[in-house]
UniProtKB/Swiss-Prot annotation:
It comes from Homo sapiens. It is linked to Global developmental delay with or without impaired intellectual development: An autosomal dominant disorder characterized by global developmental delay associated with mild-to-moderate intellectual disability, hypotonia and short stature in some patients. This is Homeobox protein cut-like 1. CDD domains: homeodomain. Residues 542-629, 934-1021, 1117-1204, 1244-1303 bind DNA. Interacts with BANP. Interacts with SATB1 (via DNA-binding domains); the interaction inhibits the attachment of both proteins to DNA. It is found in: Nucleus. InterPro entries: CUT_dom (IPR003350), HD (IPR001356), Homeobox_CS (IPR017970), Homeodomain-like_sf (IPR009057), Lambda_DNA-bd_dom_sf (IPR010982).
Amino acid sequence: MLCVAGARLKRELDATATVLANRQDESEQSRKRLIEQSREFKKNTPEDLRKQVAPLLKSFQGEIDALSKRSKEAEAAFLNVYKRLIDVPDPVPALDLGQQLQLKVQRLHDIETENQKLRETLEEYNKEFAEVKNQEVTIKALKEKIREYEQTLKNQAETIALEKEQKLQNDFAEKERKLQETQMSTTSKLEEAEHKVQSLQTALEKTRTELFDLKTKYDEETTAKADEIEMIMTDLERANQRAEVAQREAETLREQLSSANHSLQLASQIQKAPDVEQAIEVLTRSSLEVELAAKEREIAQLVEDVQRLQASLTKLRENSASQISQLEQQLSAKNSTLKQLEEKLKGQADYEEVKKELNILKSMEFAPSEGAGTQDAAKPLEVLLLEKNRSLQSENAALRISNSDLSGSARRKGKDQPESRRPGSLPAPPPSQLPRNPGEQASNTNGTHQFSPAGLSQDFFSSSLASPSLPLASTGKFALNSLLQRQLMQSFYSKAMQEAGSTSMIFSTGPYSTNSISSQSPLQQSPDVNGMAPSPSQSESAGSVSEGEEMDTAEIARQVKEQLIKHNIGQRIFGHYVLGLSQGSVSEILARPKPWNKLTVRGKEPFHKMKQFLSDEQNILALRSIQGRQRENPGQSLNRLFQEVPKRRNGSEGNITTRIRASETGSDEAIKSILEQAKRELQVQKTAEPAQPSSASGSGNSDDAIRSILQQARREMEAQQAALDPALKQAPLSQSDITILTPKLLSTSPMPTVSSYPPLAISLKKPSAAPEAGASALPNPPALKKEAQDAPGLDPQGAADCAQGVLRQVKNEVGRSGAWKDHWWSAVQPERRNAASSEEAKAEETGGGKEKGSGGSGGGSQPRAERSQLQGPSSSEYWKEWPSAESPYSQSSELSLTGASRSETPQNSPLPSSPIVPMSKPTKPSVPPLTPEQYEVYMYQEVDTIELTRQVKEKLAKNGICQRIFGEKVLGLSQGSVSDMLSRPKPWSKLTQKGREPFIRMQLWLNGELGQGVLPVQGQQQGPVLHSVTSLQDPLQQGCVSSESTPKTSASCSPAPESPMSSSESVKSLTELVQQPCPPIEASKDSKPPEPSDPPASDSQPTTPLPLSGHSALSIQELVAMSPELDTYGITKRVKEVLTDNNLGQRLFGETILGLTQGSVSDLLARPKPWHKLSLKGREPFVRMQLWLNDPNNVEKLMDMKRMEKKAYMKRRHSSVSDSQPCEPPSVGTEYSQGASPQPQHQLKKPRVVLAPEEKEALKRAYQQKPYPSPKTIEDLATQLNLKTSTVINWFHNYRSRIRRELFIEEIQAGSQGQAGASDSPSARSGRAAPSSEGDSCDGVEATEGPGSADTEEPKSQGEAEREEVPRPAEQTEPPPSGTPGPDDARDDDHEGGPVEGPGPLPSPASATATAAPAAPEDAATSAAAAPGEGPAAPSSAPPPSNSSSSSAPRRPSSLQSLFGLPEAAGARDSRDNPLRKKKAANLNSIIHRLEKAASREEPIEWEF
């Protein structure tokens, strides 16, 4: 009731207030009329009458004055009361509270009466109880009954126990039988293993004998060749001798010829001699010539013979050299296979003992469970332990339940069901299924061609199946499980290998279609090693898919979805590894499978693969382990590991095990990788032991066995490394070469590999969890092979040759070697691979060892690093090129590569001085995967997601944890996803399994089982580096999370000018920002230096952004290196908002804050790259922007810069105008623009175009008629005004953008300020749309538009108070002559330029033309008061009330402020203001404003009498 009465009272008060205001206006009008009438009376009446009436009129006037004074005081008192009433809080809550208290009091009375009644009943019960006590007879009877019941219960228990005992005995007998069966199977397997060892030994002996034969053949051939060469050499010598003899003869003949010539001359002299002598001479001469020609022919023939002999000799040399190299290659290949076999035997020396121990342990500890048969042989120890534990628990529970059988039979069912369900969730893969369909498992792409393992080498299968990429259950839990199964599979496959015979052929051409080698042209034309025919193209062979076999696609899709959900495998992983398709395609296929008959050949492929995938449990488990590892290491993206999509599609089979193998060479590497994996899993197990004591209970013996294996392996590897050390010392390989070599070797794997063995040197000290590519897949053309295999032993020269050969190969192959080539080499030529692998492994060890010495962890970086290193750039160039570190080892290689050249470029290199600082890209949120137990606990319960998210939000708020950290550390999600999930949680029933996982994680986090590292711990700082990282993270994070903290200066903000930050101060404030998580405003204000006395004082400032020199130059780069991942899109968005809100230019911001040109800033803000794609240099601007956004005084500092630039510009303009030198160099301005401009300082700026007032008027009139003029109009205007067309175009463009900007600022302020639109009458609002109202003020308070309106003064945006324009009075509608500019034009020249031709601030808004009668006094005053902080209030257009309006302007804002407070205060006091309230407030504001104006108005006119 009271609330209604209050509302009514307020309405009445509003009404009375409006009435008062209206009356006030009326009294004003009547008063004016009275004054007019009194004047007329004074003029018209005779003087004597005036004298008689004067005292009466004066008394009337006095009375009227008194009355008006009284009414004003009364109105003032009313206003005071009214204001207080408006501020009175709502009494409704207090009344509600009173009512509640009253209800409570009534309830208390009721409770008291109830208590009284209860006491009475209690007394009655006490009496009854006393009576009952006396009845001992009944008690005796009850005791007898109890005895009888106990007797019956005992009998029942005994009978049940007897039955149970019988059942247990039967079970025991059954289990014993099964145990015997398993023992039989293990003995058979042991025999198989012995067979395998024998076959290996025979194979070894055979290869040895073959090797010896080859050696003898090689020796024979070499001796034969040597003999041939000797013979050829002797022939050559003979030929040379003959040639020399011929030359000698030729010389003698030449001598004879010269003598003959001489004799001829003599003969010619003796002409008078007889004819006989002449005839003789002629004869002798002709015979000499014939002889000479014959000799010359002989010489030519001899020269040809010599050349022919030399050619044949070179040919022979080349042939023999090639044959020798081939023989050497064969020899080295045989040597390497021999070595591998020996190492394999060594490695498997204690294999039998371990196997025996494990089998004994199994047979002693665990009797096999029901319904398994041979499958149980494959079950690892932990699974058996768990099953035994469960069976014992269930038996125990069953006994307990049977004891309490009388009371609760229902409870037993409840316990049995989950017990029976659990073992099913962890199925052990039976390897006994493997031999049944080996061909089906390895079927090729099309799903039909059988690929028999009989034709493959044992290395192929042992490496593919024993590689650590197939942990058969989630990590840590089943270390022994995975080890045992791998070894069992290895034994089976190597047994299968025996059938292929021990010939040197690795692939037989028969049993499988050539199409299984996914080779594409150009290599298709070349037959492979064993003369196998080139395969037909993919498209031809794809037609051979069996069309007859129908499949139920819907059923297959359903089964796949079930398996994926059951094992928590994502569709992306499934699509990637099994189908070779994207996540979207997989989702489409599984959601809407087409019927079989409607599918194309290509469309049927995925279903073949899915069927193959479902056919074997191994595939599913392998994929599950990959999924688990992906969740552990989400930073390594799939794209990085597997870039060859077409290759993957060609070679993909439904059987996952053939696709996930690493291309390792030889079983020795495989064994090493098994041991490495076992070691890792043991470590994981140790850490997991406290959490899972039951699983670790019986694994003591097996742990010791595995440890002994590991120690032996380590000893062997240390011995190998010791053998390699001398080679390492002498090998002439620079560190950089090795750094290149290692990544190249590690980055060319052709197969999709998940994890393979790391280089030996790394694996000794630091087992790598990151996936690496195998080293064996490097393409090996003969030239490289020859070099790599020249040294079969471990001589240092050989290692160096190999490394240099690989280097050369890297250089050649960087541009052109394709993935198909890698694949072809890995698939078709495994023996060549094996031959090269030992040398490459050496090279890897070399790389690994040296890198360890230099502080890097050794590993793969990007090919771009290799390229840049080959070309030899400086470290700074190298850093510019460096992509965001994509490889797990890139961090170390960056360190090692740039370590040497750091001294050259201390400033340029963005490396931190300490190698502790992490520099690799911040990984995506990584969280450990949930265990199956955690899933089971919550997955099938109904969880209240709304309540859960509420609790999480409360806990986050209480502990001050931001959503980004929570998302990264607990949920593995981005901040956006977390925010979305917490604000709008879906109901549990509508969530998929993947969607439920975050909520399960939240629940576990609330229970304290997950992500405890997220909670802030006081006083734990790990060294200064980490401290600086966290301190940086806080201000950055503060900026990221709360976008409200962005400073937005309103139109009224115009602080006093201050100088830009000097270099030292800026560094100081930067470091303060970094070290204070929430920078206090006072501290950053202190960092601003006082205003310099004269402009040239800042000459000494360097021209870099936030200038950093010497030590501080590193600080910003260290910040960049240590900064967490930033949201570049969010930062640029907020920067753009702040710049537009405050009318700041990108040029100023770029030069002052970022040290970039306007173009670069514009590009950065328009198209920001994501953080992880940026180099360190590219991240710097974003870190600077973030620091700038976090600085509370950022806008003010830029404003100061802008004002100083403007002042400098104005000075320059004035001086240039006065000296008639329009092209004066802009020396003063450049002092203030802190950015290093691209042009040198002495270059001249273009002069600014300054338009005359009449030109501006004409252009404005043209604009009002047509804001977008046609080219013809532009040309006409240009000719009329004698301007360039470009100037006119620019003026229109600038004018349009200025008006748009004003409207935009106006809207922003109207939205952000409570008092916006204070006098926004509907007519004024409608006037806003009209193009003629350019004079609207920025605050949203316009002059009233009507037939007699004049445009009032227009306040400028911030920082433009110096350029305020005086509005034109109505009389000056015509443009004044150029000689006598109007009052506003004198100043108009200074800032109302035409188009901006050079860099510089945009022209300020122009005043519109004033075309009508004066505005009403109130409106003029209102608009003058609208922008209180923007400089002097402008005089209104109408001359009479101008004094009053200007004098009352300062007073009004304060009264408004006292009534409504400033917008910030209002926002803080009541943030729930809805638009309705705002309108109401604005309306009241206008009424009170008018009343106050009337009350406080000084009398403008005195009484006449």
